[in-house]
Amino acid sequence: MSGKLYLVATPIGNLEDITLRALRILKEVDYIAAEDTRNTLKLLNHFEIKKPLISNHRHNEENRENGLIEKLKEGKNIAVVSDAGTPGISDPGEVIARRAIEENIDVIPIPGACAAINALIASGLDTKEFVFLGFLPLNKKLRKEKLEEIKNETKTLIIYEAPHKIKDSLDIIGNRKIVLAREITKIHEEFIRGNIDEIIEKSENLKGEMILLIEGSHEANNENILNNLSLDEHYNVYEKQGLSKKEIIKKIAKDRGVNKNEIYQYFLEK
């Protein structure tokens, strides 16, 4: 009979956040697959847990899975942990979980801390709907493409970000309510709230990985409203704003995703 694979969430800063169930599982399993065995050893030593550790990080996860699956098939129980937080959420865990499921091995989540969720619930932004993006691509071109893709998203955005990249990210996203969360659950926990200029200014001297939370875009909602209007009604909206005919036609074309010549021809024939 196969063993079980446990995905065990661990504290993201404050060791008091570990759950009683997590401690029990870590004590009962045969092996612990850890993102960084040195970090996990500190956690285990604190709680006086002694178990064999197996290195399982993002650079060796796919190569390591065969050995882990073999142990599971032998009836051994394995706990997967990341350095902090929930395995599989921007951390190793997804690959081995998927493989275990393919092999009909039970995968059991042991809930606990997750930096993204902890930051969201204390952000003051909409928590009903949100999009978690984790780490953005390192490649500048791919990174820009991803930001352009999500800048009109109406749901709250959650991104793991480095301070020196915040300005470039926010320049593309545009001005709206923004929250920067850092050192979550630690002594120097901090939530920085403001608009784009305020956040960029306050983040210049900060260090370490942060959680960037961005209010959903209102522009997409406005575009949907405008697109439900007739062309004449759409024209009147911008005319009341004092725009020239040329400017109005350009904006209508952009709102509706059509060639501006089509809009120009419509009003020319009226």
Question: What is the predicted function of each stretch?
Answer:
Residues 88-103, 170:
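Short Gly/Thr/Asp-enriched flexible loops that form oxyanion-binding sites at enzyme active sites
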Residues 56-62, 136-139:
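Conserved helicase motor
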Residues 26-32, 104-108, 155-157:
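Short active-site oxyanion
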Residues 12-15, 83-87, 163-165, 217-219:
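Short glycine-rich anion-binding loops that position phosphate/pyrophosphate groups of nucleotides
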Residues 4-5, 75-79, 155-156:
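Loop/turn-to-beta-strand initiation segments
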Residues 1-56:
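Glycine-rich, flexible N-terminal cofactor/catalytic loop recognition
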Residues 96-150:
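Class I SAM-dependent methyltransferase SAM-binding "motif I" and its flanking Rossmann-like core
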